[in-house]
Amino acid sequence: MSFKFNEESFLDNSFNETLREKLTKMLNSRKSMDIKIDDHLSYANNRGSTSCSNNFDNSSSIKARDSKLDILKSDVKVCEVNFPTIPNLEILDLDVSGQPRALAKGICKISCRDALLQIQTEIEANSLLLYTNISPDFTTPLMIANDTFTIPITMTFSQIQLEAITNVFVKNSGVGISFNDVSLDFQFDCSIKLLQPHIAKRLRKSMQLVFKDVLPSALFNMSRSWFTHDGSSSQTTTDHSQEEGSRLIRLHRLTVEDLDLQDLSPVNMLKLSTLTSSRQTLSLHSTMPKYFSTIPGCLDRQNFRNFTSRMPCLSNYGGGSDDGDKHVPHIHNLQNKNLLPEEALEENDIDLKAILSIQTKIYERGISTNNDVIRPRRRKIRIKRAKKSIVNKATETSSNLNADSEITPVSSSHNATSSVNTITSLTTSSLGSTAGSSNSKNTNRSSSFTSSIMPITPLAQSSMNKKDGNLITLRQDSKVLDSMKYFTKIQDLHNIHASFNSSRETQDSNNRFRIASEMLPTKREISPIPTLNSFIEPNRRFSFVGLNHKTSHDNSWSVDEQPPPYY
């Protein structure tokens, strides 16, 4: 079953005006009720019917009337309501019974299109002021600049599309409607574009409250005039508002004196007493370096600077005097390092015990609550030893050899034999290491051969420098002058060597000229003979000592050819 509304009622602007007034009244009904309650409380307080507890009730009633933040600073005013398309109402089910409480009940479907609604109000832009209004006085800080800042705002809802399934109850006093299934869509426009997304999001979330509370109460109050006369309906509305206001007043007038203390929870009372006394228990005590006391609990933000300025630190140290004001700096920076001030160092007024106590307390504060010992950080210096390269080793070896082979001046008064033996041993060791880098085969063969050769005895010679007449400089003995080198250098000596090999069998019985053939090198194995200049280092002096060996026939050898050694 369905029917249509009369078009003439919608074409006339009277319906829109009536609906606008009703919506304005219902949107401000909650705030008007709070104002009435505040008026009754102020009137009762002026009469003196209550004690000082009423003052607390009067101040807290405004702050505690709603736990949520209220950003509205003025009444909500509905500026325009328009229905360009006539709404449609369809009755899906209807039940008429003779019960005294309800004349009829049914299920209806309401559809509305292209509706327009425009409202205006003022909001509070200072959100800090909103928090201070609802917070208790003993926890609210004192703000220097906490003035109100109101901004007018206009919100327009256009292209409203509404489809809803409702349950209708017709009673003796009015019509009650409950919305079960609601489909709502609209376009929102705000004068403050910065707040438009936030307000639109909150409005879409609050639509459920509108259809469950605001609209049913508005329709019920409007329908009460249909069933009763005008005078009686106004009187009934006034009585109802007065009864509700008096009930709320009685609730707010409730004090501790009117209640039995046994009904109060001791746990809640203990929490309240602890909360109120916490303001007086947060004392800093003495924060001097000698009388430092840690605060395990919380600390006020306004006293935090005083606390940090009196923290034990070497930068706050002023010397070893007992004056407490000397330890407190006038200006303290949290970024100051733990260093002694210049004044203490200049005046040489340093107390080692006070410095030790400060460092100990700073270390103890770094220990965690689980008694985990935190070891202090120590500076560690690690020295990495550089690995000696091969070049450095070779340099050191050559320097050691040069130091060992350095010729020292010998006095003439010393024993000539001991000096000659000493110089010979040094020369043999130095040249032996140099000659070791040659071919290993030649070295092995020459070693066994030179063991049977009589050593060459160098002769002392006077110094060439007249100024150093007391010094005797001897030429070093060298392995270059071995008989092995002489045989391989000169062709005639090589022939003599071959003749020795040919007559080896005939002279085997005498065993005089027995020379192992493998001890002498062949022509292919002959290596170039190093010259004496290759062994001479710069800034060294060498004196030449010739060989003075002669044969039995007094035939001396020439300078170019050295005679072979005798056996």
Curated annotation (Swiss-Prot):
Whichever gene encodes this chain, its name is: MDM34
Q: What does this protein do?
A: Component of the ERMES/MDM complex, which serves as a molecular tether to connect the endoplasmic reticulum (ER) and mitochondria. Components of this complex are involved in the control of mitochondrial shape and protein biogenesis, and function in nonvesicular lipid trafficking between the ER and mitochondria. MDM34 is required for the interaction of the ER-resident membrane protein MMM1 and the outer mitochondrial membrane-resident beta-barrel protein MDM10.
- GO BP annotations listed: mitochondrial genome maintenance; mitochondrion-endoplasmic reticulum membrane tethering; phospholipid transport
> What protein name does the entry list?
Mitochondrial distribution and morphology protein 34
Feature: compositional bias, Low complexity? 417-452
Classification lineage: Eukaryota, Fungi, Dikarya, Ascomycota, Saccharomycotina
Q: Which stretches make up the SMP-LTD domain?
A: 1-224
What the record says about family reads: Belongs to the MDM34 family.
GO molecular function terms noted in the UniProt entry: lipid binding
Region Disordered: which residues? 392-453
According to its record, what are the GO cellular component terms? Answer: ERMES complex
